[in-house]
C-alpha cells in the first residue's frame, strides 16, 4: 500500500488518514503504526480531546513528509501506516484504559512501534504498559505544561494528570532516565513536583528551559536517557496557547512551536520505541493551528524514528 500522492489527488481530497498514509486496520510488519485514541473521559477541565484524532488527520493532509534539507522523505525510509482508531468506550475509564492497553500491546506484537494521537493524557498509562511489556522499564521524554504525576482525584484511580505517577509506581518507567520539559503554571498545592523530583525525574520547568535553550535541554536529554528504550510523550499544552489554543488545560508562558520541533530533533540520537501526541481539543482551536502543529510534531517524531533506526541518516 502507498500514500495518496498529492500530485494525483489534491491534499483536501479523499478520506483523511494521518499524513495521507495508507489505512490498514490490521497492520503487520510496519516500522511505526499511527493509531488514534479518541477519548477524553480523564479530562479535569475543558473536554473535547476525543475529537483530536479526527481533527489532526483532517489537517495532516497539508504535510508532505519531506523536510527541507533532509534528503529522502520519511516514508522512503520507514514503512508506516494509519491503523484507524482504538474503539474506546466513553462511559468507563477503567474499561477504556484496559482496551487501549490490549490494543496497543497487540500492535507491538506485530509491528515495531506506534505513534498514538489523542485523546487525553490518561491513555498514556496504557501506552506505557504496552511498550514496557515489550522493552522493560522505559526512559521517558515528556513535554508538557504539567507533570502528570498527581495522585488520584474524586475517588477514581485514573485521570489525565496521573499517567506518569502510575508509570513510576508500576515500574514501567525508570525515573532516573526520565526528563520532563515545559512544566509551569499554577498547581493546587506547593508540593506538586515533589513526587517526580523525589523519584529522580529531571524536571525542566519552562523558566529553566528559557535559560538552557534548545541545545542545553537536548544535551541534558541525551545524557539522562542514553541508549535506553525511550518513550516520547508530547502534551500539546507544552506549547504556549498563543500557538496551540486547542487544548483542555492551557497554560500561558509555554514553549514556542519552533522550540518544541527543534528540541524533538534530539530524539533521533536516542532509541525511541513509542510516541504519543495528546490533549488536542479542536473545540477551542482557531483555524486548525493546534491540529496542524500536532501533525508537525508527529511528523517530526516519525522522521526522528527513521534517523534513530536507519544508519544512512
Swiss-Prot record:
It is an enzyme of class 3 (hydrolase). The keyword NAD does not apply. Mn(2+) 2 binds at residues 144, 146, 235, 237. Mn(2+) 1 binds at residues 121, 144, 148, 235. It catalyses: amidinoproclavaminate + H2O = proclavaminate + urea. Keywords: Hydrolase, Manganese, Metal-binding. Its cofactor is Mn(2+). PROSITE patterns: ARGINASE_1, ARGINASE_2. Its EC number is 3.5.3.22. InterPro entries: Agmatinase-rel, Ureohydrolase, Ureohydrolase_dom_sf, Ureohydrolase_Mn_BS. Binds 2 manganese ions per subunit. GO terms for molecular function: agmatinase activity; metal ion binding; proclavaminate amidinohydrolase activity. The keyword Metal-binding applies. One of its GO terms (biological process) is putrescine biosynthetic process from arginine, via agmatine. It holds the Pfam family Arginase. Pathway: Antibiotic biosynthesis; clavulanate biosynthesis; clavulanate from D-glyceraldehyde 3-phosphate and L-arginine: step 4/8. NCBIfam families: agmatinase (TIGR01230). Homohexamer. Belongs to the arginase family. This is Proclavaminate amidinohydrolase. The gene is pah.
Amino acid at each position: 500500500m502507498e500514500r495518496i500522492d498529492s500530485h494525483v489527488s489534491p491534499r483536501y481530497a479523499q478520506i483523511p488518514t494521518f499524513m495521507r498514509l495508507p489505512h490498514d486496520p490490521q497492520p503487520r510488519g510496519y516500522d511505526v503504526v499511527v493509531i488514534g485514541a479518541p477519548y477524553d473521559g480523564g479530562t479535569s477541565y475543558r473536554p473535547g480531546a476525543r475529537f483530536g484524532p479526527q481533527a489532526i488527520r483532517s489537517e495532516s493532509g497539508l504535510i508532505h513528509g519531506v523536510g527541507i534539507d533532509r534528503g529522502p522523505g520519511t516514508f522512503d525510509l520507514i514503512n508506516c501506516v494509519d491503523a484507524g482508531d482504538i474503539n474506546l468506550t466513553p462511559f468507563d475509564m477503567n474499561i477504556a484504559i484496559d482496551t487501549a492497553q490490549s490494543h496497543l500491546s497487540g500492535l507491538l506484537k506485530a509491528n515495531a512501534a506506534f505513534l498514538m494521537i489523542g485523546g487525553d493524557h490518561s491513555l498514556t498509562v496504557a501506552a506505557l504498559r504496552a511498550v514496557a511489556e515489550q522493552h522493560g522499564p522505559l526512559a521517558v521524554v515528556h513535554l508538557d505544561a504539567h507533570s502528570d504525576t498527581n495522585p488520584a482525584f474524586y475517588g477514581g484511580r485514573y485521570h489525565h494528570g496521573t499517567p506518569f505517577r502510575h508509570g513510576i509506581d508500576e515500574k514501567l518507567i525508570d525515573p532516573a532516565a526520565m526528563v520532563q520539559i515545559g512544566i509551569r503554571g499554577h498547581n493546587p498545592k506547593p508540593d506538586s513536583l515533589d513526587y517526580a523530583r523525589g523519584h529522580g525525574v529531571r524536571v525542566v520547568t519552562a523558566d529553566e528551559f528559557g535559560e538552557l535553550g534548545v541545545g542545553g535541554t537536548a544535551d541534558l536529554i541525551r545524557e539522562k536517557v542514553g541508549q535506553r528504550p525511550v518513550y516520547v510523550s508530547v502534551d500539546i499544552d507544552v506549547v504556549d496557547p498563543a500557538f496551540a489554543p486547542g487544548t483542555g488545560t492551557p497554560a500561558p508562558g509555554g514553549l514556542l512551536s519552533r522550540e518544541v520541533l527543534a528540541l524533538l530533533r534530539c530524539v533521533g540520537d536516542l532509541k525511541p520505541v513509542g510516541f504519543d501526541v495528546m490533549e488536542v481539543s479542536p473545540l477551542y482551536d482557531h483555524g486548525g493551528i493546534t491540529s496542524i502543529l500536532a501533525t508537525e510534531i508527529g511528523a517530526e517524531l516519525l522522521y526522528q524514528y527513521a534517523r534513530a533506526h536507519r544508519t544512512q541518516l
